[in-house]
Amino acid sequence: MTTLNLSIFPSVKISSSASIPGFIKIQPFLLRRKLSTVLSVTARDEGIIHNHFDFTSYMIGKANAVNEALDSAVSLREPIKIHEAIRYSLLARGKRVRPVLCIAACELVGGEESVALPAACAVEMIHTMSLIHDDLPCMDNDDLRRGKPTNHKVFGEDVAVLAGDALISFAFEHLATSTAVSPARVVRAIGELAKAIGSKGLVAGQVVDLTSGGMDQNDVGLEVLEFIHVHKTAVLLEAATVLGAIVGGGSDEEVEKLRRFARCIGLLFQVVDDILDVTKSSEELGKTAGKDLIADKLTYPKLMGLEKSKDFADKLLSDAHEQLHGFDSSRVKPLLALANYIAKRQN
């Protein structure tokens, strides 16, 4: 029997307390279709979010700001092929949840969008790197991402690996040189992002995910599954939110409350992803549906069943909302709506 020893990793618990795309702005009708469910939920969310908050417009505005900044940060230059590969994935149409979380957290603690944009872009660069590498034949071996052929299918495995590597470098360079706040805040933000993606974060989640595939579910319990998802998925949403709070000048108490919020929605994001993987088509998801089932990977529906997985998602959403109590009622609306969006998204 194969067992996984997680004792070498720090415990992270959820607290209940080949055409190259040019830059294209996201048009309102594209997001309105995706966010229609969220808006209806937002309007009735226990009175916390009032229905006059236009979440669709907020997401469109922030996503376009991020896309413009990314397009400017990673221009097409020599060597052409590697920059084509980077831009192919980085500028592909995505929801931009992580950078928007970063901006929303910054604004919540009193910062400005312009201050948060470098950190938001750095997080999206890291996220894109993780997608490129995750899709490789030696990892998840996927052919479709964001409705398009995966990077290695277009540019080859060798260039795809290098594109991901370059994005890591770009992310830290951009965060270090473009963030207009005190050096102390920049250093703190760099440390948070580095910790999130290394062998105590994203890499840890990925390696345990790889080694647990095909194992009998009686040998691998929810503790292992939570470890994978907290480290592989939640950790980067946490980093995005915490970076926004740091560069925005948040207090230590505000940063930690937002950290707990982000851990909840980060795990929620993956629980919902697991549910969608078995309930939606590839066309609806923009990526290969049912791939976790085919690969015999651990998922929440596999271990808990579909209905209990949905109940767990509801609990995580409630816990996330709880962490935002005490913040300014107007400035907190985007984060509350983002949590609802993550819970109710359809792709």
From Swiss-Prot:
It catalyses: isopentenyl diphosphate + dimethylallyl diphosphate = (2E)-geranyl diphosphate + diphosphate; isopentenyl diphosphate + (2E)-geranyl diphosphate = (2E,6E)-farnesyl diphosphate + diphosphate; isopentenyl diphosphate + (2E,6E)-farnesyl diphosphate = (2E,6E,10E)-geranylgeranyl diphosphate + diphosphate. GO terms for molecular function: (2E,6E)-farnesyl diphosphate synthase activity; dimethylallyltranstransferase activity; geranylgeranyl diphosphate synthase activity; metal ion binding. It is found in: Plastid, Chloroplast. GO terms for cellular component: chloroplast. InterPro entries: Isoprenoid_synthase_dom_sf, Polyprenyl_synt, Polyprenyl_synt_CS, Prenyl_diphosphate_synthase. CDD domains: Trans_IPPS_HT. Transmembrane segments: none annotated. Signal peptide: none annotated. Mg(2+) 2 binds at D134, D140. Dimethylallyl diphosphate binds at R145, K232, T233, Q270, K287, K297. It comes from the Eukaryota. Mg(2+) 1 binds at D134, D140. Isopentenyl diphosphate binds at K95, R98, H127, R146. Catalyzes the trans-addition of the three molecules of IPP onto DMAPP to form geranylgeranyl pyrophosphate. This is Geranylgeranyl pyrophosphate synthase 7, chloroplastic. The lineage of its organism: Eukaryota, Viridiplantae, Streptophyta, Embryophyta, Tracheophyta.
